[in-house]
Amino acid sequence: MKVAIANRQRRHPIGTPRLRKVAERILSALGYPDSELSVVITGDLGIRRVNREYLHKDRPTNVISFAMAEGEFGALNPAMLGDVIISADTAAREAEEGGVSFWSRLCFLLLHGILHITGYDHERSGEAEARRMEAKEREIFAILEREGLV
């Protein structure tokens, strides 16, 4: 399992080895132990650029995922799952608003992004699929909590 993490912001301290362990545990729980994943932690400006360029939405968001299995060459390397981009700025605001720690919110957004690149959806596939994704989020987040990763 290879998880590459790039922290491209400095405002919010992030332990990348610790975040890598969380990502590896999520992938293992989902049945992707031999996969590859790229995680980028950025700020609102960085994620806004990505959101504008690729999704045509000119605003920051909390997490964006790009699945490598989608598109013309998706089958070339099935072990390469894709990219998860998280705004640490938005994660920090959401953590404060939700009364949870920054780390907890960051890990939840990582989980949410990984679920998207492994085929889960809550936006385009209807209410039943959204409930299925939320149930999987609760299940795996509980594992992370139980194992002291969150």
From Swiss-Prot:
Cofactor: binding details: Binds 1 zinc ion.
HAMAP family: Endoribonucl_YbeY (MF_00009)
EC numbers for this chain: 3.1.-.-
Listed NCBIfam families: rRNA maturation RNase YbeY
Full protein name: Endoribonuclease YbeY
Cofactor(s) of this protein: Zn(2+)
Signal peptide: none
Function noted in UniProt: Single strand-specific metallo-endoribonuclease involved in late-stage 70S ribosome quality control and in maturation of the 3' terminus of the 16S rRNA.
Source organism: Geobacter metallireducens (strain ATCC 53774 / DSM 7210 / GS-15)
Enzyme class: hydrolase
Lineage summary: Bacteria, Pseudomonadati, Thermodesulfobacteriota, Desulfuromonadia, Geobacterales
